[in-house]
């Protein structure tokens, strides 16, 4: 799993892949809820919790999702047994030395593309800048 973020260069947005160096999937801290509208319709909602960016992400964006360390995922998911203070302590930037980022092709700007090319490192040709 990786995430995309767009770095601003002047008036241009450059898509980037941000991921763990080991390329392993990772868990994000989030919250979910199920509630009913006044008309009785069931609504399922969720949010991904963000935090201040680490040094890798800071030049790209002013926040980042909370990426959970593998050993912390079960504690986050078991709210009934994890004290609030412990859960809150997990809401911190992921160590930048375990992550990397690189430019990717502008094809990621279109939802119609779903290929490995979307995460491959990309170098913009001078004429494309």
Residue ranges and their predicted role:
Residues 1-129:
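A structured binding-face within diverse protein domains that lines the active/interaction site
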């Amino acid at each position: 799993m990786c995430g995309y973020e767009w770095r601003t260069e002047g008036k241009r947005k450059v898509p980037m892949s941000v991921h763990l160096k080991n390329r392993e999937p990772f868990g994000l801290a989030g919250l979910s809820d199920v509630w009913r509208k006044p008309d009785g319709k069931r609504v399922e909602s969720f949010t991904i919790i963000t935090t201040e960016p680490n040094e890798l992400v800071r030049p790209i964006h002013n926040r980042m999702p909370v990426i959970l360390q593998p050993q912390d995922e079960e504690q986050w998911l078991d709210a009934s047994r994890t004290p609030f203070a412990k859960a809150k302590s997990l809401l911190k930037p992921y160590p930048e030395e375990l992550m990397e980022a690189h430019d990717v092709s502008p094809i990621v700007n279109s939802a119609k593309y779903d290929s490995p090319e979307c995460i491959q490192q990309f170098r913009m040709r001078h004429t494309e800048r």
